[in-house]
Amino acid sequence: MSYQHIENLYKNQTILLFKECFVLEKIHGSSAHVAWNDGRLRFFAGGVSQLAFEALFEHARLKELFSALGHPKVTVYGEAYGGSQQGMKATYGDKLKFIAFEVLIGEAWLNVVNCVDVTQKLGLEFVAWEKVSTDLAVLDAWRDKPSVQAQRSGCGEKPAEGIVLRPLLEFRDHRGDRIIAKHKRKEFAERASGKDTEVDPARHELLVKAEAIAAEWV
Protein backbone atom coordinates (compact mmCIF):
# COMPACT_ATOMS: atom_id res chain seq x y z
CA MET A 1 0.00 0.00 0.00
CA SER A 2 1.48 3.34 -1.07
CA TYR A 3 1.65 6.21 1.40
CA GLN A 4 -1.19 8.71 1.49
CA HIS A 5 -1.16 12.15 -0.11
CA ILE A 6 -0.62 14.91 2.48
CA GLU A 7 -2.28 18.26 1.84
CA ASN A 8 -0.47 21.56 2.31
CA LEU A 9 -1.28 23.56 5.43
CA TYR A 10 -2.59 26.52 3.41
CA LYS A 11 -5.29 24.21 2.03
CA ASN A 12 -6.11 22.10 5.09
CA GLN A 13 -5.71 23.88 8.43
CA THR A 14 -7.56 21.39 10.65
CA ILE A 15 -4.35 20.63 12.58
CA LEU A 16 -4.37 24.26 13.79
CA LEU A 17 -7.44 23.55 15.92
CA PHE A 18 -5.10 21.78 18.33
CA LYS A 19 -3.00 23.89 20.71
CA GLU A 20 0.07 21.73 20.13
CA CYS A 21 1.26 19.29 17.52
CA PHE A 22 4.32 17.31 16.50
CA VAL A 23 6.45 18.73 13.71
CA LEU A 24 8.63 16.33 11.74
CA GLU A 25 11.29 17.31 9.24
CA LYS A 26 10.07 16.63 5.70
CA ILE A 27 12.79 14.84 3.74
CA HIS A 28 13.07 15.51 -0.01
CA GLY A 29 13.43 12.07 -1.57
CA SER A 30 11.26 9.21 -2.82
CA SER A 31 8.52 7.65 -0.70
CA ALA A 32 9.41 4.05 0.20
CA HIS A 33 8.49 1.51 2.84
CA VAL A 34 9.36 -1.78 4.48
CA ALA A 35 6.54 -4.23 5.22
CA TRP A 36 6.31 -7.23 7.54
CA ASN A 37 3.37 -9.54 6.85
CA ASP A 38 2.98 -12.94 8.53
CA GLY A 39 6.69 -13.63 8.69
CA ARG A 40 7.55 -12.24 5.26
CA LEU A 41 9.65 -9.14 4.68
CA ARG A 42 8.91 -6.96 1.66
CA PHE A 43 10.62 -3.83 0.36
CA PHE A 44 8.94 -1.08 -1.68
CA ALA A 45 11.61 1.11 -3.24
CA GLY A 46 9.43 3.88 -4.67
CA GLY A 47 11.40 5.79 -7.28
CA VAL A 48 14.81 4.29 -6.54
CA SER A 49 16.47 1.07 -7.71
CA GLN A 50 14.91 -1.96 -6.01
CA LEU A 51 18.30 -3.67 -5.69
CA ALA A 52 19.95 -0.56 -4.26
CA PHE A 53 17.10 -0.08 -1.79
CA GLU A 54 17.11 -3.66 -0.53
CA ALA A 55 20.90 -3.48 -0.11
CA LEU A 56 20.39 -0.82 2.59
CA PHE A 57 19.04 -3.43 5.02
CA GLU A 58 20.44 -6.45 6.84
CA HIS A 59 17.56 -8.76 5.96
CA ALA A 60 18.11 -11.60 8.44
CA ARG A 61 18.53 -9.23 11.38
CA LEU A 62 15.54 -7.14 10.34
CA LYS A 63 13.35 -10.26 10.21
CA GLU A 64 14.38 -11.10 13.77
CA LEU A 65 13.54 -7.59 14.96
CA PHE A 66 10.15 -7.49 13.24
CA SER A 67 9.32 -10.91 14.66
CA ALA A 68 10.26 -9.73 18.15
CA LEU A 69 7.66 -6.95 17.94
CA GLY A 70 4.97 -9.62 18.10
CA HIS A 71 2.67 -8.11 15.46
CA PRO A 72 1.79 -10.07 12.30
CA LYS A 73 1.48 -6.99 10.09
CA VAL A 74 3.72 -3.91 10.36
CA THR A 75 4.59 -1.32 7.73
CA VAL A 76 7.30 1.30 8.23
CA TYR A 77 6.91 4.21 5.84
CA GLY A 78 9.77 6.52 5.07
CA GLU A 79 11.89 8.23 2.48
CA ALA A 80 14.65 6.87 0.27
CA TYR A 81 16.93 9.88 0.00
CA GLY A 82 20.46 11.07 -0.71
CA GLY A 83 22.73 10.21 -3.59
CA SER A 84 21.08 10.94 -6.93
CA GLN A 85 17.60 11.37 -5.44
CA GLN A 86 15.92 14.69 -6.26
CA GLY A 87 19.25 16.44 -6.80
CA MET A 88 19.79 16.62 -3.03
CA LYS A 89 23.30 15.17 -2.78
CA ALA A 90 24.69 18.42 -1.36
CA THR A 91 22.09 18.34 1.42
CA TYR A 92 21.97 14.64 2.33
CA GLY A 93 25.26 13.21 1.04
CA ASP A 94 26.25 11.01 -1.88
CA LYS A 95 24.90 7.70 -0.52
CA LEU A 96 21.34 6.39 -0.82
CA LYS A 97 19.71 6.02 2.61
CA PHE A 98 16.33 5.27 4.18
CA ILE A 99 14.71 7.18 7.02
CA ALA A 100 11.37 6.36 8.65
CA PHE A 101 8.57 8.81 9.39
CA GLU A 102 5.46 6.67 9.95
CA VAL A 103 4.42 3.25 11.28
CA LEU A 104 1.24 1.29 10.58
CA ILE A 105 0.49 -1.77 12.73
CA GLY A 106 -2.39 -3.75 11.31
CA GLU A 107 -4.82 -0.98 10.36
CA ALA A 108 -3.74 1.37 13.17
CA TRP A 109 -1.50 4.38 12.58
CA LEU A 110 0.82 5.02 15.51
CA ASN A 111 1.37 8.45 17.00
CA VAL A 112 4.84 9.95 16.68
CA VAL A 113 6.14 8.82 20.08
CA ASN A 114 5.14 5.22 19.41
CA CYS A 115 6.58 5.42 15.87
CA VAL A 116 9.92 6.39 17.36
CA ASP A 117 9.75 3.49 19.81
CA VAL A 118 9.01 0.93 17.08
CA THR A 119 11.65 2.19 14.65
CA GLN A 120 14.28 2.22 17.40
CA LYS A 121 13.46 -1.42 18.15
CA LEU A 122 13.90 -2.17 14.45
CA GLY A 123 17.21 -0.34 14.29
CA LEU A 124 15.85 2.19 11.78
CA GLU A 125 16.51 5.92 11.82
CA PHE A 126 13.53 8.23 12.39
CA VAL A 127 13.18 11.81 11.17
CA ALA A 128 13.83 14.74 13.52
CA TRP A 129 10.70 15.74 15.43
CA GLU A 130 9.52 18.04 18.21
CA LYS A 131 6.34 18.96 20.08
CA VAL A 132 5.48 22.62 19.46
CA SER A 133 2.70 25.20 19.60
CA THR A 134 0.42 25.44 16.56
CA ASP A 135 0.81 29.22 16.52
CA LEU A 136 1.50 30.09 12.88
CA ALA A 137 4.61 32.12 13.70
CA VAL A 138 6.02 29.14 15.60
CA LEU A 139 5.26 26.75 12.75
CA ASP A 140 6.80 29.09 10.18
CA ALA A 141 9.94 29.30 12.31
CA TRP A 142 10.20 25.51 12.53
CA ARG A 143 9.59 25.17 8.79
CA ASP A 144 12.44 27.57 8.08
CA LYS A 145 14.99 25.92 10.39
CA PRO A 146 18.06 24.27 8.81
CA SER A 147 17.76 20.58 7.97
CA VAL A 148 18.62 18.33 10.91
CA GLN A 149 19.07 15.47 8.45
CA ALA A 150 21.71 17.42 6.55
CA GLN A 151 23.63 17.84 9.80
CA ARG A 152 23.21 14.16 10.68
CA SER A 153 24.62 13.35 7.24
CA GLY A 154 27.66 15.54 7.82
CA CYS A 155 26.64 18.05 5.15
CA GLY A 156 26.54 21.15 7.34
CA GLU A 157 23.78 23.74 7.46
CA LYS A 158 21.36 23.32 4.57
CA PRO A 159 17.70 24.35 4.16
CA ALA A 160 15.09 21.73 5.03
CA GLU A 161 12.25 20.99 2.62
CA GLY A 162 9.77 21.84 5.34
CA ILE A 163 7.81 20.10 8.08
CA VAL A 164 4.93 17.67 8.49
CA LEU A 165 2.40 18.48 11.21
CA ARG A 166 0.69 15.72 13.17
CA PRO A 167 -1.55 15.75 16.27
CA LEU A 168 -0.20 14.44 19.56
CA LEU A 169 -2.61 11.51 19.24
CA GLU A 170 -4.01 10.16 15.99
CA PHE A 171 -7.31 11.79 14.99
CA ARG A 172 -9.57 11.76 11.93
CA ASP A 173 -11.79 14.54 10.63
CA HIS A 174 -15.50 14.39 9.83
CA ARG A 175 -14.72 12.76 6.46
CA GLY A 176 -12.72 10.01 8.13
CA ASP A 177 -9.39 11.36 6.87
CA ARG A 178 -6.34 11.48 9.11
CA ILE A 179 -5.48 14.92 10.45
CA ILE A 180 -2.05 15.69 9.02
CA ALA A 181 -0.54 18.48 6.92
CA LYS A 182 2.73 19.57 5.34
CA HIS A 183 4.23 23.05 5.48
CA LYS A 184 7.00 23.64 2.94
CA ARG A 185 9.60 26.32 2.39
CA LYS A 186 9.21 28.53 -0.68
CA GLU A 187 12.28 26.93 -2.26
CA PHE A 188 10.35 23.64 -2.33
CA ALA A 189 6.92 25.04 -3.23
CA GLU A 190 4.74 22.89 -5.48
CA ARG A 191 3.25 25.96 -7.19
CA ALA A 192 5.36 28.48 -9.10
CA SER A 193 3.79 31.35 -7.15
CA GLY A 194 4.90 29.84 -3.84
CA LYS A 195 1.42 30.49 -2.43
CA ASP A 196 1.13 26.89 -1.25
CA THR A 197 3.69 27.76 1.46
CA GLU A 198 1.62 30.64 2.90
CA VAL A 199 -1.29 30.24 5.30
CA ASP A 200 -4.06 32.85 5.06
CA PRO A 201 -4.61 34.21 8.62
CA ALA A 202 -8.19 35.23 7.74
CA ARG A 203 -9.06 31.68 6.73
CA HIS A 204 -7.55 30.39 9.96
CA GLU A 205 -9.61 32.92 11.95
CA LEU A 206 -12.80 31.61 10.35
CA LEU A 207 -11.82 28.07 11.28
CA VAL A 208 -11.22 29.05 14.91
CA LYS A 209 -14.56 30.88 15.11
CA ALA A 210 -16.41 27.92 13.62
CA GLU A 211 -14.83 25.63 16.20
CA ALA A 212 -15.80 28.01 19.02
CA ILE A 213 -19.42 28.07 17.83
CA ALA A 214 -19.50 24.28 17.62
CA ALA A 215 -18.09 24.01 21.15
CA GLU A 216 -20.98 26.14 22.47
CA TRP A 217 -23.44 23.45 21.38
CA VAL A 218 -21.60 20.37 22.62
Where in this protein do the model-derived segments appear?
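Core nucleotide-handling region used for phosphoryl-transfer chemistry
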Residues: 1-218
